[in-house]
């Protein structure tokens, strides 16, 4: 049985990689895993929770652990692996690709890093150390196509979220499971899946919720907490407010549980406040209006502003080419501004409807369903025939 090492460093990567692993069951798969990968039987060499970071300051605090996980991963590659698949997370994964290349192991980059945001500096490194790059965003083709050769192949497969997003509740059943009165409107508060995001952004969102309750008496706030962040979320929530925390079926906490809690919130909330990341594209696909918030340490923001080559942070805005979803970043990521922007959407029907129309355009631009199946077929061909 051929062996695959699968490396992810973020919860969103775990989401994609677990679906990919389901389509490659004929192979033995190990790697750096998240909760969904572990739940379907991918054997962990290490856990993504140990290496998932945002920004320079958090990376420094976890440097020793990241170095240890990298060493463990290289040892696993040396023990006999036929294929390395890495998912986004370039700071770690590009180095791992280089080690695999030295060992003569075939390599796949599934979901390119955001080279279009950070400039082309990493493109050459990726091309030199990747046999097959599988892209999920349509505009990446023009970046990589000039580099295609016998040694580097590129394929655009469409976006996996079109297959992954499944919603099981309607508004009535969702409210019933959460004991929310029918006459209440749900507002989603999505603070991210990383410790630094929950620590910094969640308290801001909760204070924004408190401000909104002064204007509206019919709002109920729902926070979907990832398995790895449930305890941290519960520590920060002010339960004197109309707030409910929900989590995943994978959690052992005594909370309302759903297969994909974030999706249920995005679908059944009239409006959501969402931390920048993959969740913003998930929300765009689901189609209910939202705003994007983000805040990092001043030094991380300063460095990012110098390096980033794009005008927007949120993926829906990058794809659309303009700010169809308001972005409240850094100093604007504060309770008053967030509450005021939310109030605008709750009181202006035209604003609300316009964003819904724009989100539908973004969704249609992401291609057709079947991305994971197309990706797994490409990987299977590379493994069995030695070429993509």
From Swiss-Prot:
Pfam families documented for this protein: LpxB (PF02684)
UniProt pathway annotation: Bacterial outer membrane biogenesis; LPS lipid A biosynthesis
An example Gene Ontology biological process: lipid A biosynthetic process
Coiled coil: none
Keyword annotations of the record: Glycosyltransferase, Lipid A biosynthesis, Lipid biosynthesis, Lipid metabolism, Transferase
Any one cellular-component term (Gene Ontology): membrane
Reaction catalysis annotation: a lipid X + a UDP-2-N,3-O-bis[(3R)-3-hydroxyacyl]-alpha-D-glucosamine = a lipid A disaccharide + UDP + H(+)
Enzyme Commission number(s) of this protein: 2.4.1.182
InterPro entries documented for this protein: Glyco_trans_19
GO MF, one example: phospholipid binding
Enzyme class name: transferase
The family this protein is said to belong to: Belongs to the LpxB family.
Functional description taken from the UniProt entry: Condensation of UDP-2,3-diacylglucosamine and 2,3-diacylglucosamine-1-phosphate to form lipid A disaccharide, a precursor of lipid A, a phosphorylated glycolipid that anchors the lipopolysaccharide to the outer membrane of the cell.
HAMAP family per record: LpxB
Protein name, UniProt field: Lipid-A-disaccharide synthase
Organism encoding this protein: Sulfurihydrogenibium sp. (strain YO3AOP1)
Encoding gene (name): lpxB
């Amino acid at each position: 049985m051929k062996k695959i090492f699968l490396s992810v460093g973020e919860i969103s990567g775990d989401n994609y990689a677990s679906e990919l692993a389901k389509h490659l069951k004929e192979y033995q798969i190990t790697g750096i895993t998240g909760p969904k990968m572990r739940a379907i039987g991918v054997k962990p060499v290490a856990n993504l929770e140990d290496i998932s970071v945002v920004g320079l300051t958090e990376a420094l605090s976890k440097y020793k652990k990241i170095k240890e996980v990298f060493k463990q991963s290289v040892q696993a590659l040396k023990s006999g692996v036929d294929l390395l698949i890495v998912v986004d997370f370039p700071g770690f994964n590009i180095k791992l690709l280089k080690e695999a290349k030295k060992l003569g192991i075939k390599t796949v980059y599934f979901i390119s890093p955001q080279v279009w945001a950070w400039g082309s500096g990493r493109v050459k490194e990726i091309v030199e150390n990747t046999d097959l790059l599988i892209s999920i965003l349509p505009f990446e083709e023009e970046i990589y196509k000039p580099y295609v050769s016998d040694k580097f192949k590129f394929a655009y497969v469409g976006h996996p979220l079109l297959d992954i997003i499944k919603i099981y509740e309607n508004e009535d059943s969702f409210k019933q499971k959460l004991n929310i009165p029918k006459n209440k409107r749900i507002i989603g508060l999505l603070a991210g899946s990383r410790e630094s995001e929950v620590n910094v952004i969640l308290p801001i969102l909760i204070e924004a919720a408190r401000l909104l309750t002064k204007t509206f008496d019919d709002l109920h706030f729902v926070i979907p907490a990832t398995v790895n962040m449930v305890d941290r979320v519960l520590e920060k929530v002010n339960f004197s407010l109309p707030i409910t925390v929900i989590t995943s079926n994978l959690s052992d906490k005594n909370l309302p549980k759903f297969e994909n809690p974030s999706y249920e919130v995005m679908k059944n909330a009239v409006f959501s406040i969402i931390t920048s990341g993959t969740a913003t594209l998930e929300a765009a696909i689901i189609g209910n209006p939202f705003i994007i918030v983000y805040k990092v340490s001043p030094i991380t923001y300063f460095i990012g502003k110098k390096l980033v080559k794009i005008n927007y942070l949120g993926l829906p805005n990058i794809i659309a080419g303009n700010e169809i979803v308001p972005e409240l970043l850094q100093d604007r990521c504060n309770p008053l501004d967030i509450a005021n922007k939310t109030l605008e959407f709750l009181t202006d029907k035209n604003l609300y409807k316009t964003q819904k129309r724009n989100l539908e355009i973004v969704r249609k631009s992401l291609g057709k369903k079947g991305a994971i199946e197309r990706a797994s077929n490409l990987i299977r061909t590379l493994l069995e025939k030695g070429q993509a």
